């Protein structure tokens, strides 16, 4: 026989072991209760309803072939319009005229290279209202510009944004490019507040024989360069603004105004001695007596107040002591009467 323990779970409190019953093991299967039937019992199969509707799927057939659309190729027209041919003819005629003239100096090269570029730009802007079809290469223009830039680099740098001025030139002393001046050229006066670097570059290019008309460079270069009559004439013909500006500077550079010294303070006493003492107001003897009497009365009143406070404090202390003694006596009498009873 085999013994096993079967615990009883009915009515067992917490933290208390259930009573043990010794009995023989039964071969019967344990009966599931109604509470545990949902957990351990067999689940009934779920029935899924059939779909009543029908779906027709349309698949593409394999016979049909998808042909991608081809983009139309844009035809490039290489034909040059009439406007481009006219530009080429003008450039060729200018080259022939330049070759007939022969080699020119540096100043003329700088003056002639600029109008070619401007004419090319003007023709391209005026005669091209719409973009040209095809590539039009103006080889002659580019070759000419490259040779001119290689020969005269310094002069072309200065002549890009400034005209060359002279005393005998029209339109305010500025010559148009392409016409060399017979007399020595003179640069214009600088605007106040601007740098003199372009004028120095022009001096290096033109040489030591030519002097600028600006007053600043004339003052600096008096010792280094000789005085020529042409240079003196050009300096006299300088604009009136620069002369006025120079005279204004001279006025400012004069001796400063001298301030008048302030006179010293007049003291009524000597410096070694200090100031005299302050004068007190004059009082009559009657007023002095009245003031002394009022001070005495004030002191007396303060003394009387202190005395009264002391007396009051003493009386209050004595009263409190008397009250305490009376209370103690009453307590003692009450205790003695209670013990006797």
Curated annotation (Swiss-Prot):
Biased composition annotated in UniProt, kind: Polar residues: 108-127
Comp. bias intervals (Basic residues): 243-252
Membrane-crossing segments per the record: none
Biased composition (Basic and acidic residues): 72-101
Homology family: Belongs to the UPF0607 family.
Disulphide-bridged cysteine pairs: none
InterPro entries, alphabetized: POM121-like_prot_1
Organism: Homo sapiens
Region (Disordered): 70-131, 218-279
Official protein name in the record: Putative UPF0607 protein ENSP00000383144
Pfam families: POM121
């Amino acid at each position: 026989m085999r013994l096993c323990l079967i615990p009883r779970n009915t009515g067992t409190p917490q933290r208390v072991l259930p009573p043990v019953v010794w009995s023989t093991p039964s071969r019967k299967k344990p009966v599931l209760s109604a509470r545990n039937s949902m957990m351990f019992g067999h689940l009934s199969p779920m029935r899924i309803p059939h779909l009543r509707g029908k779906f027709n799927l349309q698949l593409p057939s394999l016979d049909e072939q998808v042909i991608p659309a081809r983009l139309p190729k844009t035809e490039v027209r290489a034909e040059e319009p009439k406007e481009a041919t006219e530009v080429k003819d003008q450039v060729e005629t200018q080259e022939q005229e330049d070759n007939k003239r022969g080699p020119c100096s540096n100043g003329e090269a700088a003056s002639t290279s600029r109008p070619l570029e401007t004419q090319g730009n003007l023709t391209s802007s005026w005669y091209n209202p719409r973009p040209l079809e095809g590539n039009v290469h103006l080889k002659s223009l580019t070759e000419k510009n490259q040779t001119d830039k290689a020969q005269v680099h310094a002069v072309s740098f200065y002549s890009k944004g400034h005209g060359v001025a002279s005393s005998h030139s029209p339109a305010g002393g500025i010559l148009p490019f392409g016409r060399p001046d017979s007399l020595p050229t003179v640069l214009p006066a600088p605007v106040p507040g601007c740098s003199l670097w372009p004028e120095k570059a022009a001096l290096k290019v033109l040489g030591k024989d030519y002097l600028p008309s600006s007053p600043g460079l004339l003052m600096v270069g008096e010792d280094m360069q000789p005085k020529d009559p042409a240079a003196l004439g050009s300096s006299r013909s300088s604009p009136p603004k620069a002369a006025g500006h120079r005279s204004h500077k001279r006025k400012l550079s004069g001796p400063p105004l001298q301030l008048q010294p302030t006179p010293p303070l007049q003291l009524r006493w000597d410096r070694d001695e200090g100031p005299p003492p302050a004068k007190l107001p004059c009082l009559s003897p009657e007023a002095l007596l009245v003031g002394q009497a009022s001070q005495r009365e004030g002191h007396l009143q303060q003394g009387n107040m202190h005395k009264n406070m002391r007396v009051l404090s003493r009386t209050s202390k004595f009263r409190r002591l008397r009250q305490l003694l009376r209370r103690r006596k009453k307590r003692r009498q009450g205790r003695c009467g209670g013990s006797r009873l």
